[in-house]
UniProtKB/Swiss-Prot annotation:
Keywords: ATP-binding, Cell membrane, Membrane, Nucleotide-binding, Phosphate transport, Translocase, Transport
Species annotation: Streptococcus pyogenes serotype M12 (strain MGAS2096)
Enzyme Commission number: 7.3.2.1
Summary of subunit composition and partner proteins: The complex is composed of two ATP-binding proteins (PstB), two transmembrane proteins (PstC and PstA) and a solute-binding protein (PstS).
Gene transcribed to yield this protein: pstB1
Classification via SMART domains: AAA (SM00382)
Predominant localisation class: membrane
Annotated protein name in UniProt: Phosphate import ATP-binding protein PstB 1
Length: 253
């Protein structure tokens, strides 16, 4: 019996200044899976990711057609509350971006925006979120130190904890390890594999090894087209498209 998808993208196109940069993409995300989005720079991976929680709305030169259905509703409906949407569909960026405040305040930032002031609720959220991001033991004795003073890898895990604190169902990650050293990147990967037990994840990555290690499904993008999508093992062992095979084998990138 096939698992029902948690989010359905249908015929999604994105235009920047009337130039079509994402072309009629259809893709599903499935619960408790990691989907990797691979392809050369400028192929549309990050554009798709930013469309899933409407980050592209912040650019007035962007036009979007098609649909993304989550919880039975098209997220591009005028009735969609984008603040609530981004709590349900969180995002972690390429460069760690902790706010210039304490580790504690970074994690509870979204909760405070929701009006939560109860210290016991905030304390519990901080501990559970930092544990979820696999960094609690490293920072539990310095929660009121500035998050900016942490290493790059620790900062990125605090950013993951900040997303977890709002209780999302889907976590989007845009090359979350590309700015990190290999050891820090490895810790992030271990964290993501643990998180997929409770969340749905989609990750943009330039590393074929990372996509192979982490993901259950992979989508290959080229010049705005989703050329191929399917189970990662099958795609890496027997890609259906020559372009996919050439990219995975490093013939272009």
């Amino acid at each position: 019996m096939m698992t029902e998808s948690i989010l359905q993208i249908r015929d999604l196109s994105v235009y920047y200044n009337q130039k079509k940069t994402l072309k009629d993409v259809s893709l599903d995300l499935y619960p408790n899976e990691i989907t990797a989005l691979i392809g050369p720079s400028g192929s549309g991976k990050s554009t798709l990711l930013r469309s899933i929680n409407r980050m592209n709305d912040l650019n007035p030169e962007v036009t979007i057609t098609g649909s993304i259905v989550y919880n039975g509703h098209n997220i591009y409906s005028p009735r969609t509350d984008t603040v609530d949407l981004r709590k349900e569909i969180g995002m972690v960026f390429q460069q760690p971006n902790p706010f210039p405040m304490s580790i504690y305040e970074n994690v509870v930032y979204g909760l405070r925006l929701k009006g939560i002031r109860d210290k016991s609720i905030l304390d519990h959220a901080v501990e559970s979120s930092l544990k979820g991001a696999s960094i609690w033991n490293e920072v539990k004795d310095r929660l009121h130190d500035s998050a900016v003073g942490l290493s790059g890898g620790q900062q990125q895990r605090v950013c993951i904890a900040r997303v977890l604190a709002t209780s999302p169902r889907i976590i989007l990650l845009d090359e979350p390890t590309s700015a990190l050293d290999p050891i820090s990147a490895g810790k992030i990967e271990e964290t993501l594999l643990l998180l997929k037990k409770d969340y749905t994840l989609a990750i943009v990555t330039r590393s074929m090894q990372q996509a192979s290690r982490l993901s259950d499904r992979t989508g290959f993008f080229l010049e705005g087209d989703l050329l191929e999508c399917g189970p990662t093992k099958a795609m890496f062992m027997n890609p259906k498209r020559k372009e996919t095979e050439d990219y995975i084998s490093g013939k272009f990138g």
